[in-house]
């Protein structure tokens, strides 16, 4: 299958908060989005974990 599970990590505290799926054949770049981090208690940038 082309869809793989990925983990999103907070850029400030490095906590892994979200799990999602993406098609790695169509989207080769790393996913980056602003989401809520409960440890930072604010909306911060989350990037795809290596």
UniProtKB/Swiss-Prot annotation:
The answer to whether UniProt assigns keyword Ribosomal protein to this entry is yes
Record keywords = Ribonucleoprotein, Ribosomal protein
Q: Which Pfam families match?
A: Ribosomal_L33 (PF00471)
Instruction: Show the InterPro entries listed in the entry.
Output: Ribosomal_bL33, Ribosomal_bL33_CS, Ribosomal_bL33_sf, Ribosomal_zn-bd
One GO biological process term: translation
PANTHER family in the record, alphabetically?
50S RIBOSOMAL PROTEIN L33, CHLOROPLASTIC, LARGE RIBOSOMAL SUBUNIT PROTEIN BL33C
- UniProt similarity note: Belongs to the bacterial ribosomal protein bL33 family.
HAMAP family xref list: Ribosomal_bL33
> What name has this protein been given in UniProt?
Large ribosomal subunit protein bL33
Q: What is the lineage of its organism?
A: Bacteria, Bacillati, Mycoplasmatota, Mycoplasmoidales, Metamycoplasmataceae
Q: Which gene encodes it?
A: rpmG
